[in-house]
């Protein structure tokens, strides 16, 4: 089967556990996910089946929205609720106004240092493996983009914020850095991913929904179409001649002024056909094709 599931990941399991459960329910090996969530985090995780796995890479350019609870006055070695407490300090002096003004410093492009408990590699080893051995190493700072950050409420010592951010943002690091700026320390108490591009909590499924669909013989019916993952890409409709060229792996010429990194191609019936990318000579080549090549007519 080919398609996408918008799964609401429950607390306490890994993103790989989600993939394993989907593989079991669908009896399908070719399954992948579109964005890791830590075990303590919940919320949206798109899961791709069959040919849709070829679209996972295009999710890197879409934004994600999180609902985060941050507790002031405490730091942990993992920057979240799973770690050991490393620092305590009173936060009685912190006001809502102070928090609001400090949060505004995090809007736009910011520099983050990945937590030691992360999947980033250092000399070929995952940082979390080093951290579990009690080893701390210097991490390379990274640029992250915060499109919006909203303080929802603050009841000392816990604040709730909604964050819209780009690919590669560590909400744990944001919580840690916020605490440092306020002078009292902080850690990420809980995290919910509310949206990831076209996918959001409102139309997500849990595993009970999948099991029910399996019992009813409707597993295929709950899959989202492939193009759900690339709704953010510019699109173009092409005639049969150009579609045939793409299906056969040949480049095409488009009269386009802009040159985005990728364009979604649809046919005259409004069916998703391919992803094309520009070449330096002005042509476009098929990066991914999702309809099969028609048999060539017999030369005789």
UniProtKB/Swiss-Prot annotation:
Signal peptide: none annotated. It comes from the Bacteria. Its EC number is 5.4.99.25. SUPFAM superfamilies: Pseudouridine synthase. One of its GO terms (molecular function) is RNA binding. GO terms for biological process: mRNA pseudouridine synthesis; tRNA pseudouridine synthesis. The active site is at 38 (nucleophile). InterPro entries: PsdUridine_synth_cat_dom_sf, PsdUridine_synth_N, tRNA_psdUridine_synth_TruB, TruB_C. Gene3D superfamilies: Pseudouridine synthase. Keywords: Isomerase, tRNA processing. The keyword Transmembrane does not apply. It catalyses: uridine(55) in tRNA = pseudouridine(55) in tRNA. PANTHER family: PSEUDOURIDYLATE SYNTHASE TRUB1, TRNA-PSEUDOURIDINE SYNTHASE. Belongs to the pseudouridine synthase TruB family. Type 1 subfamily. Responsible for synthesis of pseudouridine from uracil-55 in the psi GC loop of transfer RNAs. This is tRNA pseudouridine synthase B. It comes from Dehalococcoides mccartyi (strain CBDB1).
């Amino acid at each position: 089967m080919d398609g996408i599931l918008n799964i609401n990941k429950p607390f306490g399991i890994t993103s790989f556990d989600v993939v394993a459960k989907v593989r079991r329910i669908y009896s399908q090996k070719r399954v992948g996910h579109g964005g890791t969530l830590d075990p303590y985090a919940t919320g949206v995780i798109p899961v791709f089946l069959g040919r849709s796995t070829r679209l996972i890479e295009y999710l890197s350019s879409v934004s994600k929205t999180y609902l985060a609870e941050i507790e002031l006055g405490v730091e942990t070695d993992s920057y979240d609720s799973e770690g050991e407490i490393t620092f305590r300090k009173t936060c009685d002096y912190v006001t809502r106004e102070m928090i609001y003004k400090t949060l505004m410093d995090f809007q736009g492009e910011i520099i983050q240092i990945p937590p030691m408990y992360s999947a980033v590699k250092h000399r070929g080893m995952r940082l979390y493996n080093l951290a579990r051995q009690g080893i701390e190493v210097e991490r390379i700072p990274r640029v992250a983009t915060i499109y919006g950050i909203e303080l929802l409420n603050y009841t000392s010592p816990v604040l709730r914020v909604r964050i819209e951010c780009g690919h590669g943002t560590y909400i744990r690091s944001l919580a840690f850095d916020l605490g440092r700026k306020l002078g009292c320390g902080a850690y990420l108490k809980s995290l919910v991913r509310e949206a990831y591009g076209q996918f959001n909590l409102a139309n997500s499924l849990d595993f009970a929904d999948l099991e029910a669909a399996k019992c009813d013989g409707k597993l295929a019916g709950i899959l989202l179409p492939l193009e759900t993952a690339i709704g953010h890409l510019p699109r173009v409709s092409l005639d049969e001649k150009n579609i045939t060229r793409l299906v056969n792996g040949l480049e095409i010429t488009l009269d386009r002024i802009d040159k985005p990194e990728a364009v979604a191609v649809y046919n005259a019936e409004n069916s998703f056909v391919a992803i094309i990318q520009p070449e330096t000579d002005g042509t476009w080549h098929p990066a991914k094709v999702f309809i099969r090549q028609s048999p060539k007519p017999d030369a005789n």
